[in-house]
Amino acid sequence: MTISKLVLASGSPRRRELLAQMGYQFEVVVPNVEEKRAAAESPAQYVERLSRDKALAGAALVAAEAVVIGSDTIVVKDQQVLEKPRDFADAKRMLLKLSGSQHQVMTGVSVTCRGITHSVVVTTEVWFKTLSEQEIEAYWQSGEPCDKAGSYGIQGLGGRFVTRIEGSYHAVVGLPLYETDQLLHKF
């Protein structure tokens, strides 16, 4: 099947940039999906469901023949999901938890068209240097952590906190290029 219309169901400018980097022409819709983890869901199940919910909600907003991509990214430390911070205190708590240690970034990607949905979860291991309270305060003041899972962006100022990664850099940013391309080739 040739993709006649591709839609990204995401308000994330980073996901738009990454999909464009892959050479795809696409439209953007921003579906309203509640991001609430069910008690029995593992972090991987949660992020996969969110990506699927976003793809399906996006599909409901566009023509039936459209191929729709939904994606979500979470940060996981000790099986605890760290999402976008509510305020400075929340961001500080998260960054102190990540400081000087290893965590996982999980990005779920789902692609749907005409009732068929394919999904993948990409997990990347990330290591942080030890952060001082002054670094955390200055980083918060930059405004960068406000809309990011785990309160940091690897592609921006937060990248200076990362000492090492194992896995997909692009998945940490918000859209794993290889895996997304593989899913799109199923349509």
Curated annotation (Swiss-Prot):
Catalytic activity: dTTP + H2O = dTMP + diphosphate + H(+); UTP + H2O = UMP + diphosphate + H(+)
GO molecular function, one term: dTTP diphosphatase activity
Entry annotation: catalytic residues: D72 (proton acceptor)
Any one of the GO BP annotations: nucleotide metabolic process
Major subcellular location class: cytoplasm
Site (Important for substrate specificity): R14, T73, Q155
Cofactor annotation: a divalent metal cation
Keywords, ordered alphabetically: Cytoplasm, Hydrolase, Nucleotide metabolism
InterPro entries linked to this entry: ITPase-like_fam, Maf-like
UniProt subcellular location: Cytoplasm
Pfam families according to UniProt: Maf
Cellular-component GO terms for this entry: cytoplasm
PANTHER family per record: BIFUNCTIONAL DTTP/UTP PYROPHOSPHATASE/METHYLTRANSFERASE PROTEIN-RELATED, BIFUNCTIONAL DTTP_UTP PYROPHOSPHATASE_METHYLTRANSFERASE PROTEIN-RELATED
UniProt family annotation: Belongs to the Maf family. YhdE subfamily.
Functional summary from the UniProt entry: Nucleoside triphosphate pyrophosphatase that hydrolyzes dTTP and UTP. May have a dual role in cell division arrest and in preventing the incorporation of modified nucleotides into cellular nucleic acids.
Stated name of the protein: dTTP/UTP pyrophosphatase
Phylogenetic placement of the source organism: Bacteria, Pseudomonadati, Pseudomonadota, Gammaproteobacteria, Vibrionales
